[in-house]
């Protein structure tokens, strides 16, 4: 089969947020999402009816939750569907660093648990749909600063990976 035939029915959720209501801009994130959409459509042959593109103002929490909770379940066939998710924008960690959040366009960095998308909850919801596979492109970091070094949240703590010296580095 040609690759277009194999990929055309893959559902894609593509989100890119440059302009935030309450956070500094994530430069070019909206363009990254639009380019990914075009690449998926033209390069992979994925049907626009199987793709949801949310950019800037459209990428608010309500719209994002609607796609994940209403649109996506109708597109997933258990153990058959291969899902693609692309996100470009800001992420933040909770003050204690235990929870990671994806900032939507209207998220308030001071009210993460109420206004941002929990990465853990997103993963749980996707796993509960039982797709065959999930490919995620997450162009976000959880450092608490933008590319221009603007602070997203005064109390934000960066997430760092620390190697346990006793365990060593895996082969």
Predicted regions and their residues:
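Pro/Ala/Gly-rich low-complexity, hydrophilic intrinsically disordered segments
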Residues: 1-11
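Short glycine-/polar-rich loops that comprise or flank the Walker A/P-loop
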Residues: 9-10, 47-50, 131-133, 170-171
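Acidic/histidine-rich, surface-exposed loop or edge segments in extracytoplasmic proteins
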Residues: 12-22, 48-50
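Active-site-proximal C-terminal subdomain of hydrolase catalytic domains
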Residues: 16, 33, 55, 131-171
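Glycine- and acidic-residue-enriched helix-capping/strand-helix junction motifs
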Residues: 20-34, 38, 112
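Signal peptide-proximal N-terminal region
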Residues: 35-50
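Short beta->alpha junction loops
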Residues: 51-61
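Caspase-like (clan CD) cysteine peptidase catalytic core
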Residues: 62-88, 92-151
């Amino acid at each position: 089969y040609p690759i277009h035939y194999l990929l055309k029915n893959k559902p894609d959720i593509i989100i890119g947020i440059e302009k935030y209501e309450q956070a500094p801009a994530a430069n070019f994130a909206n363009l990254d999402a639009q380019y990914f959409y075009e690449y998926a459509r033209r390069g992979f042959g994925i049907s626009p009816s199987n793709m949801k593109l949310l950019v800037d103002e459209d990428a608010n929490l309500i719209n994002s939750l609607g796609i994940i909770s209403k649109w996506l379940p109708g597109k997933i066939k258990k153990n058959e569907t291969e899902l693609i998710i692309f996100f470009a924008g800001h992420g933040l960690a909770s003050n204690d660093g235990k929870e990671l959040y994806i900032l939507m366009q209207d998220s308030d960095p001071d009210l993460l648990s109420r206004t941002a998308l929990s990465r853990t909850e997103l993963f749980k919801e996707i796993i509960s749909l039982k797709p065959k596979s999930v490919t995620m492109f997450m162009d976000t970091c959880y450092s608490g600063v933008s590319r221009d070094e603007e602070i997203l949240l005064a109390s934000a703590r960066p997430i760092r990976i620390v190697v346990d010296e006793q365990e060593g580095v895996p082969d």
